[in-house]
Amino acid sequence: MAQETNQTPGPMLCSTGCGFYGNPRTNGMCSVCYKEHLQRQQNSGRMSPMGTASGSNSPTSDSASVQRADATLNNCEGAAGSTSEKSRNVPVAALPVTQQMTEMSISREDKITSPKTEVSEPVVTQPSPSVSQPSSSQSEEKAPELPKPKKNRCFMCRKKVGLTGFDCRCGNLFCGLHRYSDKHNCPYDYKAEAAAKIRKENPVVVAEKIQRI
């Protein structure tokens, strides 16, 4: 079989025009078209009067033709496998060249990027002391701030109120007797706040003036 595959010529298309590869042993046809051709010949032989006389020998001829078709199929597959192996072996030989090209490009990129990293190192280290100075100054400014003690006495009578005290809008804490604005002379202007709230909730809607032509 190996000698037969080596002696086969290059791939050729089927003579019937089906698009598959043909074989000179099958009259330039592919395996499928060759089987159809054999079946047509057998059918035409059966229809002839000569074929009726030799009806007993037809099964043997059919089996022989099928064996021949199988042998041609095996030959075609072997030829196709040899051509595919040759086509696969071609890019394998070209792999070392591509690897060398990639290694050369990687080495050039490393040489180009190496001086950039050396220049960027002092630039990063220089602003480090300037960044630390404002952080220390901010910590010094925040240090003197102390939490304000909670008010727990009435602003008027200085009575301990605790959690039962009343906060006024003027910002002071009062007991139950002095919580009203008229009891502790509250300086907060409630009228101005109410007027501003009314203006905000009820805006004045004015129609646009008609422009004369």
Swiss-Prot record:
Record PROSITE patterns: ZF_A20 (PS51036), ZF_AN1 (PS51039)
Zinc fingers (A20-type), renumbered ranges: 8-42
GO CC terms, sorted: cytoplasm
Modified residues (N6-acetyllysine): K209
Subcellular location: Cytoplasm
Comp. bias (Basic and acidic residues): 139-148
Any single Pfam family the record assigns to this protein: zf-AN1
UniProt zinc finger (AN1-type) residues: 148-194
Classification via Gene3D superfamilies: 1.20.5.4770, AN1-like Zinc finger (4.10.1110.10)
GO BP terms, alphabetized: face development; fibroblast migration; in utero embryonic development; platelet-derived growth factor receptor signaling pathway; respiratory system process; skeletal system morphogenesis; smooth muscle tissue development; vasculature development
Ligand binding (Zn(2+) 2): C154, C157, C175, H178
Binding site for Zn(2+) 3: C168, C170, H184, C186
Classification via InterPro entries: AN1-like_Znf, AN1_A20_ZnFinger, Znf_A20, Znf_AN1
SMART domains linked: ZnF_A20, ZnF_AN1
Comp. bias intervals (Polar residues): 40-66
Keywords per UniProt: Acetylation, Cytoplasm, Metal-binding, Phosphoprotein, Ubl conjugation pathway, Zinc, Zinc-finger
Sequence positions that bind Zn(2+) 1: C14, C18, C30, C33
Disordered: annotated span: 39-149
Function summary: Involved in protein degradation via the ubiquitin-proteasome system. May act by anchoring ubiquitinated proteins to the proteasome. Plays a role in ubiquitin-mediated protein degradation during muscle atrophy. Plays a role in the regulation of NF-kappa-B activation and apoptosis. Inhibits NF-kappa-B activation triggered by overexpression of RIPK1 and TRAF6 but not of RELA. Also inhibits tumor necrosis factor (TNF), IL-1 and TLR4-induced NF-kappa-B activation in a dose-dependent manner. Overexpression sensitizes cells to TNF-induced apoptosis.
Domain notes: The A20-type zinc finger directly binds polyubiquitin chains and associates with the 26S proteasome. The zinc-finger A20-type domain is essential for inhibition of NF-kappa-B activation.
Oligomeric form and interacting partners: Homooligomer and/or heterooligomer. Interacts (via A20-type domain) with IKBKG and RIPK1 and with TRAF6 (via AN1-type domain). Interacts with ubiquitin and polyubiquitinated proteins. Identified in a heterotrimeric complex with ubiquitin and SQSTM1, where ZFAND5 and SQSTM1 both interact with the same ubiquitin molecule.
Record-given protein name: AN1-type zinc finger protein 5
Species assigned in the record: Rattus norvegicus
Gene symbol of the encoding locus: Zfand5
